[in-house]
């Protein structure tokens, strides 16, 4: 991924970075207080957004990057108090917040790309939003079924 410099690959780099850094950040979340985790989420959100907006040659990427950083920080703060993770291996857990951040990033990039190319939002956002809702519904149903012991 890294040697590539086209817009598509820069956006993929940002998405992969967001996913893996949030995963590693939440893997060590129990060692720090929530304020440090929120600051870390803000920094990664800001840097990832800055990377994407640089790929689109946005005139003023700072404000939009700060907004995205705050959204990721808010997601991190809420997730810190309600951490859920999936067992990948006995020693490796995948935090749900990583999946949610990646999905929100996917929808956000599609939104910005549609605005950048002056395309209709409904056409460009329908599939990503439905995919995000479907994945979030599956995750929520799974967590609720585990919580209420409906499945084994």
Protein language model annotation of sequence segments:
Residues 139-152:
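Juxtamembrane boundary at the C-terminal end of a transmembrane helix
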Residues 28-43, 90-104:
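Structural signature of hydrophobic alpha-helical transmembrane segments
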């Amino acid at each position: 991924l890294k040697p590539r410099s086209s817009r598509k690959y820069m956006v993929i780099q940002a998405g992969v970075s967001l996913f893996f850094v949030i995963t590693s950040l939440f893997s060590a979340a129990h060692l720090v207080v929530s304020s440090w985790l929120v600051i870390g989420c803000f920094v990664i959100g800001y840097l990832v957004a800055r990377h994407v907006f640089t790929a689109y040659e946005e005139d003023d990427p700072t404000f939009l990057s700060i907004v995205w950083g705050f959204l990721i920080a808010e997601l991190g703060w809420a997730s810190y108090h309600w951490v859920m993770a999936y067992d990948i291996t006995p020693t490796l857990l995948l935090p749900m917040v990583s999946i949610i951040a990646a999905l929100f990033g996917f929808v956000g990039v599609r939104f910005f790309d549609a605005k950048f190319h002056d395309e209709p939002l409904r056409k460009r956002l329908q599939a990503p939003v439905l995919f995000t809702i479907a994945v979030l519904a599956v995750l929520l149903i799974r967590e609720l079924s585990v919580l209420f012991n409906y499945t084994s």
